[in-house]
């Protein structure tokens, strides 16, 4: 995967009814450490690679390390992140021959689950993609076993392109259907 080198970053914050999507900040470090060390959140992403304490040491003071990562804020607190990046051409799974599609991903703290926050945030990010990179195909990959992620992808309008084995599990690869 590679960052969005063709997009000015950071963008202006995106404000929805309940959320703010913005660049990550120093005050997000604690929430990022919680997100990246939570076994439930990371269950379909290979599991936590570090403890929360280790991550609090490893995450840079300025966690805004690359373009394409939106921190999601709800009621003044970091609750998750959305990543937007170019899908590297080396991957075997693409929707266009030359690859390099825009790929979106999302991770949210369990306190947000079932409240529509992931849907609201991801819709806002998809709107930003459409305004910033009009006409670009948008793709998403999630484990087939990650039923909540798969439901969200379908709810957002992603349709299955194919399934494949990767990272020791069956993966679902989809693209955002044209309206």
Residue ranges of model-derived segments:
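Active-site rim helix/loop that mediates acceptor-substrate recognition in acyltransferases
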Residues: 48-71
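Acyl-donor (CoA/ACP) binding surface of acyl/acetyltransferases
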Residues: 1-44, 69-179
């Amino acid at each position: 995967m590679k960052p969005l080198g063709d997009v000015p970053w950071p963008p202006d914050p995106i404000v929805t009814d309940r959320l703010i999507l913005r660049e990550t900040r120093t005050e997000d470090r604690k929430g990022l450490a919680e997100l990246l060390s939570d076994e439930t959140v990371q269950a379909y992403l290979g599991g936590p690679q570090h403890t929360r304490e280790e991550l609090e040491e490893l995450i840079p003071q300025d966690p805004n390390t690359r373009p394409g990562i939106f921190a999601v804020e709800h009621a003044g607190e970091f609750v998750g992140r959305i990543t937007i990046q170019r899908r590297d051409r080396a991957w075997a799974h693409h929707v266009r021959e030359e690859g390099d599609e825009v790929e979106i991903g999302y991770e949210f703290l369990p306190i947000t689950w079932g409240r529509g926050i992931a849907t609201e945030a991801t819709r806002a990010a998809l709107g930003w993609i459409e305004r910033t990179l009009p006409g670009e195909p948008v793709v998403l990959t999630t484990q087939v076993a990650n039923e909540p992620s798969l439901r969200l992808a379908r709810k957002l309008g992603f349709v299955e392109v194919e399934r494949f084995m990767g990272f020791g599990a069956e993966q679902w690869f989809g693209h955002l259907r044209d309206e």
